[in-house]
Amino acid sequence: MSSTAPSPVVVAASPSDQSHSLHNVFVYGSLLADDVVRVLLKRIPQSSSAVLHGYQRFSVRGRVYPAILPVENNRVTGKVLFGITKPELDIFDIFEDVEYERSVVEVSLADGSEKLSALTYVWSNNRDPDLLYGDWNFEMPF
């Protein structure tokens, strides 16, 4: 992780803007591992530790990756990947598959220096019986 956060990247607002824009992506699970990101993107983007307020991370029964859902008075720690291109975002969409929906969220950099808009992947089924309470542990699956 970089010790100083790069300038925030503006997230594209409309589909016509997205082909040439760069994106911030908040990650909180398997994409925290640089090795996973490197395999997918063929590079490791600049990143900064961040917090997503108003969400909770869940373990998913039988899976090595977590899910997040909106839950008041909770927070998810992770990191923001900066400068993600549209083709790279498409790769993340395929990797995350249909179990997740890409959403725009506001995250706070962990050092408290600023808030910024980012994309993240939210579990699509908030009534999924396989969601387990208790935070997912990044170290356990790997």
What do these predicted regions represent?
Residues M1-F142:
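Glycine-aromatic micro-motifs
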